[in-house]
Every structure is written in structure tokens, then in C-alpha cells.
């Protein structure tokens, strides 16, 4: 390990990143709370302000990926489609196999200039995660319980609110419903066999109802669906902790722009269309494992400096008073004060580790496991 790599793996560096993220995130959450008074007066202004506030937080994680770890993402796509990216609303269908797949999606959104306006269909539990979950509430993320009887009306109502959104956005949906694991895959393929559907090797059976309602509600304002198939070179298994340690990964993502008019309006036909899409995605993954590349022309969108500038702003604002506080605490010489300081550091470290744990595959959602669910019905 070189000197830079050794430095990146040090706890003190991680402490600095975590402090800046937590402190700035809580400040942003507080400002977002204050902006609620704007909503009844000017809803569109409220949305624009909160998109920028959201960027202040989410771009810090993108900075870690792009500038700290140096991770790169190569896009494989039709050159005729790339001029549309970032210039239109789109529904993004992304496979859900890696711990940092969401972060790669954010990186792409940042390079397209629309990170602050990125939306996602997420499990309701994430709304209670400090900073990120609270921030998402103010930018109209769509939360679901993953119980269709409860979600049918609430998800549709939330989606319809996005029809008059004032800026371009990407709406991400993981149709598999949960992150891929071997256990969940085995159960999912049993369901596929029972329904007479072709088996998938690299994906779970897609849950079609969430996708169908999303397309139905946004059809008139979203001109395309982006089918994104993500993988990593050299069979890497990237983690958020690895990114924090400065480990560099190289992602490859195959992006297909599918015009909305190519997707059936009928719910049953839309469901069949999505199953066919996932069979194609599976074939693309199989080809990638065989050859190491996806179809179409490789393209690397240029890295923008704004995520780094944003982090440097927050660091310069927050670190000086933080270190002043540390010096005063240490110089006090009080054993009680020092013990309190150590306790605060331990609690902060545990809190950040818990938030990182939300992304870890082996500690992820039990959704899709046969022990905690009924058989899939969509």
C-alpha cells in the first residue's frame, strides 16, 4: 500500500469525513424544516431550494466515490441517445446487486447535472434514517411499504405530485424490490418456475406493479425509460466502506434509452414487457461476464468539480470550530471531559457504521426471504 493509500485508510480521515457529513447534514435538515413555510406560498420555489439543499448532502457521497476513491464509471450506450441524458425526465430501471449501485447512479446523475433532482422509489424504513432519509422527505422521494394493498393509492398519489415538477429529474426504481443475494435468488426463481416464467441467472424476478404504476402516472411527463445494467470489472464486490477507505473501483454500465411510447399502457402487457426487459438484462450480464464489456459505444461523462467544491466549503466552515472545540476539551485536563469526548466519538462512529450497514448486502433487507414474506403475487 502506498503512502496515499495508507492515509486514506486512517480512522482520523474517516472521522473528518463523517463529522463534516453529519454536521452539514443536520444543518441542511434544519434549513429544510424552515423552508416548509414556503410550500403554501410558492411550491415550485420550495422544490428548487430543496433540490439545492439535497445536493449539498448527496454530493458529499459522490465526492467520496469520484474524488476520494477515484472510482470511474464507463457508460455503454447508443451515441444517438446520449444527447438526451440530463436534458429530459426519465425513469431509470437499475439492477440491484451491489452495495454501491445507488452511489454509481448518483455519480451518473451528478455528471449529467441533475443530482439534486434525482428521485427514487424507496422502502419506507429509509425515511427514518437520519440526514439522508430526512432529506429525502423534503425532496418528495416516494416511499413504499412494499405491501401492494397499502401502496397502490399512496404511491400513485405521490407520483402524480411529480407531474408538475419544475426541473428535469431521474426517477430510479429497483424493480427487483430488494438487493440480490443467492438465497433470495433461489426463492425468486422458484416463484418464476411456478408462474411459467424463464429463469434469470443474474437478477431476481422483477416486481411489476410498482413499475406499471410509475409508468402510468408519469407517462405524459416522462419521455423515456433508461434501462441501466451495472457491473464491475474483475469481479469486484465494491462496498461503501471500501470507498471510504479510498479503494478504487471501475464500474461499467449499459444504458438503453427506451421511448415511453414503446411501453404498453395496459398493466398486464406492461408487466410482460418488464419481464422481457429483465430477460434481456440477464443476457447482457451473461455477455459481460464472458467478454468483460457491454454492447454499444463506451462513453465516460466528464467529472464535474462541484461535488468537491461543495465538500471543501462545508469542511472550511465546520472543521475550524471543531478543532478549536477539541483543543479546548483536551487542554481542560478534566478526566470527565476527556471521557465524554471519547464517548461522543464512539457514538458518532457507531452511528456512521450503522448508516453504512444499511447498504451492506449481508445486513440488508429480509424482503424476498421465504421466512419473512408470503409468496410474490405480482
From Swiss-Prot:
<dbReference type="GO" id="GO:0012505">
    <property type="term" value="C:endomembrane system"/>
</dbReference>
<dbReference type="GO" id="GO:0016024">
    <property type="term" value="P:CDP-diacylglycerol biosynthetic process"/>
</dbReference>
<comment type="function">
    <text>Converts 1-acyl-sn-glycerol-3-phosphate (lysophosphatidic acid or LPA) into 1,2-diacyl-sn-glycerol-3-phosphate (phosphatidic acid or PA) by incorporating an acyl moiety at the sn-2 position of the glycerol backbone. Exhibits high acyl-CoA specificity for polyunsaturated fatty acyl-CoA, especially docosahexaenoyl-CoA (22:6-CoA, DHA-CoA).</text>
</comment>
<keyword id="KW-0594">Phospholipid biosynthesis</keyword>
<keyword id="KW-0012">Acyltransferase</keyword>
<feature type="transmembrane region" description="Helical">
    <location>
        <begin position="11"/>
        <end position="31"/>
    </location>
</feature>
<protein>
    <recommendedName>
        <fullName>1-acyl-sn-glycerol-3-phosphate acyltransferase delta</fullName>
        <ecNumber>2.3.1.51</ecNumber>
    </recommendedName>
</protein>
<dbReference type="Pfam" id="PF16076">
    <property type="entry name" value="Acyltransf_C"/>
</dbReference>
<dbReference type="GO" id="GO:0042171">
    <property type="term" value="F:lysophosphatidic acid acyltransferase activity"/>
</dbReference>
<keyword id="KW-0808">Transferase</keyword>
<dbReference type="InterPro" id="IPR032098">
    <property type="entry name" value="Acyltransf_C"/>
</dbReference>
<feature type="short sequence motif" description="HXXXXD motif">
    <location>
        <begin position="96"/>
        <end position="101"/>
    </location>
</feature>
<dbReference type="GO" id="GO:0003841">
    <property type="term" value="F:1-acylglycerol-3-phosphate O-acyltransferase activity"/>
</dbReference>
<keyword id="KW-1133">Transmembrane helix</keyword>
<keyword id="KW-1208">Phospholipid metabolism</keyword>
<comment type="pathway">
    <text>Phospholipid metabolism; CDP-diacylglycerol biosynthesis; CDP-diacylglycerol from sn-glycerol 3-phosphate: step 2/3.</text>
</comment>
<dbReference type="GO" id="GO:0006644">
    <property type="term" value="P:phospholipid metabolic process"/>
</dbReference>
<feature type="transmembrane region" description="Helical">
    <location>
        <begin position="125"/>
        <end position="145"/>
    </location>
</feature>
<dbReference type="GO" id="GO:0005741">
    <property type="term" value="C:mitochondrial outer membrane"/>
</dbReference>
<comment type="similarity">
    <text>Belongs to the 1-acyl-sn-glycerol-3-phosphate acyltransferase family.</text>
</comment>
<keyword id="KW-0444">Lipid biosynthesis</keyword>
<dbReference type="InterPro" id="IPR002123">
    <property type="entry name" value="Plipid/glycerol_acylTrfase"/>
</dbReference>
<keyword id="KW-0812">Transmembrane</keyword>
<feature type="transmembrane region" description="Helical">
    <location>
        <begin position="311"/>
        <end position="331"/>
    </location>
</feature>
<dbReference type="GO" id="GO:0005783">
    <property type="term" value="C:endoplasmic reticulum"/>
</dbReference>
<keyword id="KW-0256">Endoplasmic reticulum</keyword>
<feature type="transmembrane region" description="Helical">
    <location>
        <begin position="338"/>
        <end position="358"/>
    </location>
</feature>
<dbReference type="GO" id="GO:0005789">
    <property type="term" value="C:endoplasmic reticulum membrane"/>
</dbReference>
<keyword id="KW-0443">Lipid metabolism</keyword>
<keyword id="KW-0472">Membrane</keyword>
<dbReference type="Pfam" id="PF01553">
    <property type="entry name" value="Acyltransferase"/>
</dbReference>
Amino acid at each position: 500500500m502506498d503512502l496515499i493509500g495508507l492515509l486514506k485508510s486512517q480512522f482520523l480521515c474517516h472521522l473528518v469525513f463523517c463529522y463534516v457529513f453529519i454536521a452539514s447534514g443536520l444543518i441542511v435538515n434544519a434549513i429544510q424544516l424552515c423552508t416548509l413555510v414556503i410550500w403554501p406560498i410558492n411550491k415550485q420555489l420550495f422544490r428548487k431550494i430543496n433540490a439545492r439543499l439535497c445536493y449539498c448532502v448527496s454530493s458529499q457521497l459522490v465526492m467520496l466515490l469520484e474524488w476520494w476513491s477515484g472510482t470511474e464509471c464507463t457508460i455503454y450506450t447508443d451515441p444517438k441517445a446520449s444527447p438526451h441524458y440530463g436534458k429530459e425526465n426519465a425513469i431509470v430501471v437499475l439492477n440491484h446487486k451491489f452495495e454501491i449501485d445507488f452511489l454509481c447512479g448518483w455519480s451518473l446523475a451528478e455528471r449529467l447535472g441533475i443530482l439534486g433532482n434525482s428521485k427514487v422509489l424507496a422502502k419506507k424504513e429509509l425515511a427514518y434514517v437520519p440526514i439522508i432519509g430526512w432529506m429525502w422527505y423534503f425532496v418528495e422521494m416516494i416511499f413504499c411499504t412494499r405491501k401492494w394493498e397499502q401502496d397502490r393509492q399512496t404511491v400513485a398519489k405521490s407520483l402524480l405530485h411529480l407531474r408538475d415538477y419544475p426541473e428535469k429529474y431521474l426517477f430510479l426504481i429497483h424493480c427487483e424490490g430488494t438487493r440480490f443475494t443467492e438465497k433470495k435468488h433461489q426463492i425468486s426463481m422458484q416463484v418464476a418456475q411456478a408462474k411459467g416464467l424463464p429463469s434469470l441467472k443474474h437478477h431476481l424476478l422483477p416486481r411489476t406493479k410498482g413499475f406499471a404504476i410509475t409508468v402510468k402516472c408519469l407517462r405524459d411527463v416522462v419521455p423515456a425509460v433508461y434501462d441501466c445494467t451495472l457491473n464491475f470489472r474483475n469481479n469486484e464486490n465494491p462496498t461503501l466502506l471500501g470507498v471510504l477507505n479510498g479503494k478504487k473501483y471501475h464500474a461499467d454500465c449499459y444504458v438503453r434509452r427506451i421511448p415511453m411510447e414503446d411501453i404498453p399502457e395496459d398493466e398486464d402487457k406492461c408487466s410482460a414487457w418488464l419481464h422481457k426487459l429483465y430477460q434481456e438484462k440477464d443476457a447482457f450480464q451473461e455477455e459481460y461476464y464472458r467478454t468483460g464489456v457491454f454492447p454499444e459505444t463506451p462513453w465516460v461523462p466528464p467529472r464535474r468539480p462541484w461535488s468537491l467544491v461543495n465538500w471543501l466549503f462545508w469542511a472550511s466552515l465546520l472543521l475550524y470550530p471543531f478543532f478549536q472545540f477539541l483543543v479546548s476539551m483536551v487542554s481542560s485536563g478534566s478526566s470527565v471531559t476527556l471521557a465524554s469526548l471519547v464517548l461522543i466519538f464512539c457514538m458518532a462512529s457507531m452511528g456512521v457504521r450503522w448508516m453504512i450497514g444499511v447498504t451492506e448486502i449481508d445486513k440488508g433487507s429480509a424482503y424476498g426471504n421465504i421466512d419473512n414474506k408470503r409468496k410474490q403475487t405480482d
